[in-house]
């Protein structure tokens, strides 16, 4: 595999700490993964984030397949080189008009890695817009230290324990 990002995209990532939009997996494949997630939810009987917030790829092998998708791995390789490890995978099932949310956080605070050379790839399996709760970022926040994260215990917060 070779990195697929342009020099300009890599520079943007290094400066701002995020990169979007990025052509990810084709819509038909996203639909297949969304169907696998729905099947997984049905078999579990609960939403997967209840049990699999960080290591979902261990219980759901199709998550490993998704994590190895060449479109994603090629982009990551452009940012950190070819030595890539899938360290964690999270599943958040949030339907349209769902009042729940994911609170502001830094992914790096959950992994305890030092130095911070990890990359998070956020993959939406369905359409994601501001109106239905898309990912939001604070540009440049990757340059500072991990901030203190307060547990809210809010039942509407998908990150709550």
Annotate the PLM regions.
Residues 1-113, 150:
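Non-heme Fe(II)-dependent double-stranded beta-helix
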Residues 27, 66, 115, 119, ...:
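Alpha-helix initiation and capping sites
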Residues 130-161:
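Double-stranded beta-helix
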């Amino acid at each position: 595999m070779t990195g697929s990002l342009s020099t300009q995209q890599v520079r943007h990532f290094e400066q701002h700490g995020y990169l979007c939009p990025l052509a990810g997996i084709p819509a038909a494949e996203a639909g297949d993964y969304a169907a696998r997630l729905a099947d997984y939810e049905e078999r579990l009987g609960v939403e997967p984030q209840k049990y699999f917030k960080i290591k979902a790829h261990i219980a759901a092998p199709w998550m490993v397949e998704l994590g190895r998708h060449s479109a994603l791995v090629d982009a990551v390789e452009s940012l950190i080189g070819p030595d890539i490890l899938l360290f964690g995978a999270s599943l958040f099932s949030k339907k349209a008009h769902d009042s729940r949310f994911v609170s502001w956080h830094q992914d790096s605070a959950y992994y305890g890695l030092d130095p911070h050379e990890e990359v998070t790839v956020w993959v939406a399996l369905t359409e994601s817009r501001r109106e239905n709760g898309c990912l939001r970022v604070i540009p440049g926040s990757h340059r500072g230290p991990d901030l203190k994260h307060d547990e809210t215990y809010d039942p509407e917060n998908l990150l709550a324990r």
